[in-house]
Amino acid sequence: MPSEEAVAQARERAIPVLDAWMTGFNALDLQAWKATMHFPHFRLASGIMHRWEDADMDDTFIARVRTGLGNIGWHYSVWTRREIVHCSDEKIHVDTQFTRYREDGSVVAAHDSLYVLTYEDGRWGIKLRSSFAR
């Protein structure tokens, strides 16, 4: 386990990135969302490892995301857990849970995930997400 001081420093680095990621996601603002990522960017979900370059995340990509979320009645998501489990000066592992909500405030689903943030090109960004969401 990392020391309390290391975890506190990692939280100062990671939480603003995760907050910005969720804000961009909820707005379906592709540019804001991408600004929180490092590329290539990876997502492991439903047994499939997805790999995206910056150029892969375009209007067609966000349209697919919007359609998929609309199909489940999604309106917004919130973080319900963010715990630093491992950290260094170049990488942070964050055990997360997020909850998806409908417009009326009812829960669509809650999913556990692991987010890996890396320090590249002078900034922290999300490099990998491993999620139990579909």
Feature-to-residue mapping (PLM):
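Hydrophobic alpha-helical core bundles mediating ligand binding, dimerization, or RNAP-core interactions
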Residues: 18-21, 25, 37, 41, ...
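Beta-strand residues in well-ordered beta-sheet regions across diverse protein folds
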Residues: 94-95, 127
